[in-house]
């Protein structure tokens, strides 16, 4: 249980620091204790520890990816945060397939700025083999005309569709768990958390790398965020995008209170400590921190989705790159 505000001793903090800096695994109870403690004190110390752990495993490289909304709107699922769900009247644009020439132009623009990965993202519960045959030519052109690593985020997978993606040249599949298993039913009822895990397993068995993270600020507790971080560790996910809820009008989560900056920074730092070898990737919502978003990278983040997101705007590519360089990052990743 999340036990309220309290402070832990210097000896306990020092023991946790020594453990994680020597390659040991932080325990769930230790992460919860740090979250409780840092809600009142020693936030800078936690952030410094997260940076040290990140540097230990990843140096000063930052892994950049970008996405394109390849199929928008009319989604059958009822995720309560999502502008693309057909259950809510959000006014989002709807289209069956984005113009391939636009995709290639966007990909090349991103590549010119040092982005290393590019993903097609589709609205909907899943994609059919027929749809994948439609987008195969886009992936072929990406492979022929760019050096970007091609990724996909297309909902729930079956073994057949996972294998088709591999045959098309896709290297990495993204499927967010969204939130912890204990909170998922509060976020979505049209599919289950276990459906997400099955998709991750199908992708991995087919030979795809896996990218999976979630959204914070959905009404979950700090303890449930920590649960998610440990669930991702158990699944051995090595690319973890963390979104900060950007409330969409007319969705059930439109009026949820915003997280405080302190809560956000504690969350990012703990994800880094719990998943030291993963790329902890900032995603949608980081621009809500405005001029303070650089603090996410001082809290251990070492990856980012750059450019615009699916139905909300990001920061411009050049602005992002300038921020990363000013923070001392080199563009590109040591991720294997």
UniProtKB/Swiss-Prot annotation:
Belongs to the radical SAM superfamily. Biotin synthase family. [2Fe-2S] cluster binds at residues 119, 151, 211, 281. It comes from Desulfotalea psychrophila (strain LSv54 / DSM 12343). Its EC number is 2.8.1.6. NCBIfam families: bioB (TIGR00433). Binds 1 [4Fe-4S] cluster. The cluster is coordinated with 3 cysteines and an exchangeable S-adenosyl-L-methionine. This is Biotin synthase. Residues 57-286 form the Radical SAM core domain. [4Fe-4S] cluster binds at residues 75, 79, 82. It holds the Pfam family Radical_SAM. The keyword Iron-sulfur applies. Signal peptide: none annotated. Transmembrane segments: none annotated. Pathway: Cofactor biosynthesis; biotin biosynthesis; biotin from 7,8-diaminononanoate: step 2/2. Keywords: 2Fe-2S, 4Fe-4S, Biotin biosynthesis, Iron, Iron-sulfur, Metal-binding, S-adenosyl-L-methionine, Transferase.
């Amino acid at each position: 249980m999340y036990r309220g505000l309290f402070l832990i001793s210097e000896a306990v903090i020092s023991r946790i620091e020594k453990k994680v800096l020597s390659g040991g695994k932080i325990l769930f109870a230790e992460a919860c204790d740090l979250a409780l403690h840092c809600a009142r004190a020693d936030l800078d110390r936690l952030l410094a520890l997260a940076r040290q752990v990140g540097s230990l495993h990843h140096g000063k490289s930052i892994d950049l990816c970008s996405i394109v909304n390849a199929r928008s709107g009319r989604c059958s699922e009822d995720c309560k945060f999502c502008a693309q769900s057909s259950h809510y009247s959000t006014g989002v644009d709807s289209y069956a397939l984005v113009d391939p020439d636009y995709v290639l132009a966007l990909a090349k623009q991103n590549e010119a700025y040092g982005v290393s990965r590019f993903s097609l993202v589709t609205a909907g519960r899943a994609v059919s083999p027929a749809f994948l045959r439609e987008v195969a030519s886009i992936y072929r052109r990406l492979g022929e005309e760019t050096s970007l690593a091609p990724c996909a985020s297309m909902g729930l997978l079956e073994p057949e569709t996972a294998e088709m993606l591999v045959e098309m040249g896709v290297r990495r599949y993204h499927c967010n768990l969204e939130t912890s298993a204990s909170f998922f039913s509060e976020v979505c009822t049209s599919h289950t958390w276990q459906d997400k895990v099955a998709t991750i397993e199908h992708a991995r068995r087919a030979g795809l790398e896996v990218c999976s993270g979630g959204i914070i600020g959905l009404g979950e507790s700090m303890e449930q965020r920590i649960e998610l971080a440990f669930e991702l560790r158990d699944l051995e996910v090595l690319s973890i995008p963390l979104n900060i809820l950007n409330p969409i009008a007319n969705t059930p989560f439109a009026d949820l209170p915003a997280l405080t900056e302190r809560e956000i920074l504690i969350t990012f730092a703990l994800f880094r400590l719990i998943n030291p070898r993963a790329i902890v990737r900032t995603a949608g919502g980081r621009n809500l921190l405005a001029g303070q978003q650089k603090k996410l990278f001082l809290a251990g983040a070492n990856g980012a989705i750059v450019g615009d997101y699916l139905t909300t705007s990001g920061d411009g590519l050049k602005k992002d790159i300038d921020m990363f360089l000013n923070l001392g990052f080199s563009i590109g990743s040591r991720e294997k």
